[in-house]
């Protein structure tokens, strides 16, 4: 999946106020009564009113081939809300809607189109508020405290469905085959699409479409659906409905990156920082019973304990996986934090990354050449930096207007309090010593001869993750760093944005009139003692990067206020999220992987043991989406990420890449 800005819809509104695509010369919905047509064709054609009360699972998954104005989604959301109100004790509690859109509407056009349906306004306004920026890939939107999830995939549906992870196979309960008419948009209505629909459909899953075109009916039958005609809506004579009445054989395309979940719904999380806090929320939302074990006497005493941390994406022209992950993680994080019903100090003031030397200027120029949407990142010339940031630096750079800063410690503490209100159990001063399989679960041995057993375990304990026999071979490393807390000055108080250079400097937090400046970097160290050298170096790096800035020289670190923490990182700068891989079994099973890919078995992992680690210095950006990915995987639900990016997050990735090339693998 190439990283490029998605092209917005090219449309106009006709005399009836209906949006019409200029490119496809077709309406987005019926001039007569688009809302009733949606109810008849898609909700009625899939028999959803009758199926919801009898659905045997807590989640119902709908997929759609063209999002357009979101009419189908909004109509279904309204119907689902009405169902939940009428059937509060039903097994079905959550709706998951997956849709693909090559040319998404601009937010203003979306709002204008929604004026047609005032009865949908309560739902339409929520969609407009979370409408994502035009970036390729999956945008997960959470509504109604997670009872409704929308996965919006921006890009060509035929390309995107070929890039979906195998974990989405046979997950879709109902398909809405929608879009511009086949005669207007033949490129979408392909046999490849029909085959993808069949691959994703659950046995017994259904489909409905407004068209009755013969090639569509025959193509869906060839793909595996049993098809029938039904009376069309209004003046349309016929439409098509279908059922997946068979279980298609679906071999795993990349078994070495296969992800497995669990049906046990009970887990222990080891940790006490932002990763474990956000994962707790994500699992509780899915009905899990969760117990958190924290080694310290309180949360956020490790790497998540800083006063201020910057939120902005990590981009690189030469690393597609990095771009795909962090651009979508960043936009998800902003939506997630804005929705969180907890208080924490933050300011979405923007982040400006400056080119202080030739190397950093070249890196920024490469990022700006990637055709990024202006909502994500824009160039800023040296003479405009002072106006944007409030301070003079004599450097040009790149600005992330949606970025900013937040207090990780406060966020972590308050998210855990929220999770406790939802049923989370927390055990402090529980230092995990080791874990082993017992019966159908895990036996946890803690310091002080304390024990516990759990069905599923997630290791989210930062740099301590590799201290167990199951994880000792993981290629992760510790990084100790010191952040200095400096009092504001009249000049520093002018700083309006987070500055990033060969370090970073935050605007003052109004709650304490202090800034954060940092951070030192000591790879392989776990030393958390205060360092006067680090304190001075944090100040000196700022001065060295902006030698003409008098305000930088006035930075005062003499009061020795600082915080030292230890991060867990990987050499490819991406987190490790998923099953804990079995190192020894991987080397045995994949000894001949380079020559025998076709014979490869599923990735050797420890059953019901997962990990959420190596967030590095971008945990505030990556943690919300990673928590959502892991909770979805564990719950065997659709994952909001394409297969190749998921592979880049797999904890076994560095070993497997070498084995695929026939190279030797070393532990650590």
Curated annotation (Swiss-Prot):
One example GO MF annotation: oxidoreductase activity, acting on the CH-NH group of donors
Cofactors (names): FAD
Gene Ontology, cellular component aspect: cytoplasm
Protein name, as recorded: tRNA 5-methylaminomethyl-2-thiouridine biosynthesis bifunctional protein MnmC
Protein location: Cytoplasm
Record has Transferase as a keyword: yes
Catalytic activity: 5-aminomethyl-2-thiouridine(34) in tRNA + S-adenosyl-L-methionine = 5-methylaminomethyl-2-thiouridine(34) in tRNA + S-adenosyl-L-homocysteine + H(+)
Source species: Escherichia coli (strain SMS-3-5 / SECEC)
EC number: 2.1.1.61, 1.5.-.-
Region feature (FAD-dependent cmnm(5)s(2)U34 oxidoreductase): 270-668
Coiled-coil region(s): none
Keyword vocabulary terms for this entry: Cytoplasm, FAD, Flavoprotein, Methyltransferase, Multifunctional enzyme, Oxidoreductase, S-adenosyl-L-methionine, Transferase, tRNA processing
Similarity field: In the N-terminal section; belongs to the methyltransferase superfamily. tRNA (mnm(5)s(2)U34)-methyltransferase family.
The gene coding this protein: mnmC
Function: Catalyzes the last two steps in the biosynthesis of 5-methylaminomethyl-2-thiouridine (mnm(5)s(2)U) at the wobble position (U34) in tRNA. Catalyzes the FAD-dependent demodification of cmnm(5)s(2)U34 to nm(5)s(2)U34, followed by the transfer of a methyl group from S-adenosyl-L-methionine to nm(5)s(2)U34, to form mnm(5)s(2)U34.
Main subcellular localisation: cytoplasm
Record region (tRNA (mnm(5)s(2)U34)-methyltransferase): 1-245
């Amino acid at each position: 999946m190439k990283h490029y800005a998605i092209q917005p819809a090219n449309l106009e509104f006709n005399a009836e106020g209906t949006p019409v695509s200029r490119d496809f010369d077709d309406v987005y919905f019926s001039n007569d009564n688009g809302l009733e047509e949606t109810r008849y064709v898609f909700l009625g054609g899939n028999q959803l009113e009758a199926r919801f009360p009898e659905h045997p699972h807590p989640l119902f998954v709908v997929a759609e081939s063209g999002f357009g104005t979101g009419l189908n989604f909004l109509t279904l959301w309204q119907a689902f809300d009405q169902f939940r109100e009428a059937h509060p004790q039903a097994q079905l509690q959550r709706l998951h809607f997956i849709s693909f859109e090559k040319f998404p509407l601009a937010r203003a056009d979306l709002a204008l189109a929604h004026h047609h349906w005032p009865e949908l306004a309560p739902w339409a306004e929520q969609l407009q508020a979370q409408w994502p920026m035009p970036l390729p890939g999956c945008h997960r939107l959470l509504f109604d405290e997670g009872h409704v999830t929308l996965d919006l995939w921006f890009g060509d549906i035929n390309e995107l469905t070929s890039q979906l992870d195998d974990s989405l196979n046979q997950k879709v309960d109902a398909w809405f085959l929608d879009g511009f008419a086949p005669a207007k948009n033949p490129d979408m209505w392909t046999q490849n699409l029909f085959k993808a629909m069949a691959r994703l459909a659950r046995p017994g899953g259904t489909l409905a479409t407004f068209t009755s075109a013969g090639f569509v009916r025959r193509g869906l039958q060839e793909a595996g659906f049993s098809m029938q005609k039904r009376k069309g809506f209004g003046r349309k004579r016929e439409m098509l409905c279908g059922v997946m009445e068979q279980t298609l054989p679906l071999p795993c395309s990349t078994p070495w990156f296969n992800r497995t979940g669990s049906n046990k719904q009970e887990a222990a999380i080891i940790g006490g920082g932002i990763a474990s806090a956000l994962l707790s929320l994500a699992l509780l939302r899915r009905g899990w019973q969760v117990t958190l074990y924290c080694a310290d006497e309180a949360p956020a005493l490790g790497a998540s304990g800083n006063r201020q941390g910057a939120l902005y994406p990590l981009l690189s022209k030469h690393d597609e996986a990095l771009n795909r992950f962090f651009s979508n993680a960043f936009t998800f994080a902003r939506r997630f934090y804005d929705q969180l019903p907890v208080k924490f100090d933050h300011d979405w003031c923007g982040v400006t990354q400056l080119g202080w030397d030739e190397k950093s200027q070249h890196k920024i120029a490469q990022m700006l050449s990637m055709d990024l949407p202006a909502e994500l990142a824009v160039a800023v010339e040296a003479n405009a930096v002072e106006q944007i940031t409030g301070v003079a630096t004599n450097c040009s750079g790149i600005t992330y207007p949606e970025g900013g800063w937040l207090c990780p410690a406060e966020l972590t503490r308050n998210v855990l309090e929220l999770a406790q209100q939802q049923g989370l159990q927390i055990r402090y001063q529980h230092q995990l010593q080791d874990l082993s399989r017992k019966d159908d679960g895990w036996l946890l041995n803690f310091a002080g001869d304390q024990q516990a057993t759990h069905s599923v375990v997630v290791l989210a304990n930062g740099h301590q993750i590799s201290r167990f026999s199951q994880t000792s071979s993981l290629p992760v490393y510790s990084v100790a760093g010191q952040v200095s807390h400096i009092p504001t000055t009249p000049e520093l108080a002018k700083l309006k944005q987070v500055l990033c250079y060969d370090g970073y400097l935050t605007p003052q937090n109004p709650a304490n009139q202090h800034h954060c400046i940092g951070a030192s970097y000591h790879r392989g160290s776990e030393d958390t003692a205060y360092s006067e050298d680090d304190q001075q170096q944090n100040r000196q790096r700022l001065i060295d990067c902006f030698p003409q800035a008098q305000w930088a020289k006035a930075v005062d670190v003499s009061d020795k206020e600082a915080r030292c923490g230890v991060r867990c990182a990987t050499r490819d700068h991406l987190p490790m999220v998923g099953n804990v891989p079995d190192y020894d079994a991987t080397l045995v099973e994949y000894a001949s992987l380079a020559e025998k890919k076709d014979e490869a078995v599923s990735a050797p992992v420890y059953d019901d043991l997962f990990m959420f680690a190596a967030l590095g210095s971008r945990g505030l950006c990556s943690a919300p989406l990673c928590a959502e990915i892991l909770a979805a995987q564990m719950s065997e639900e659709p994952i909001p990420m394409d297969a190749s990016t998921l592979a880049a997050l797999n904890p076994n990735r560095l070993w497997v890449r070498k084995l695929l090339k026939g190279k030797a693998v070393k532990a650590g």
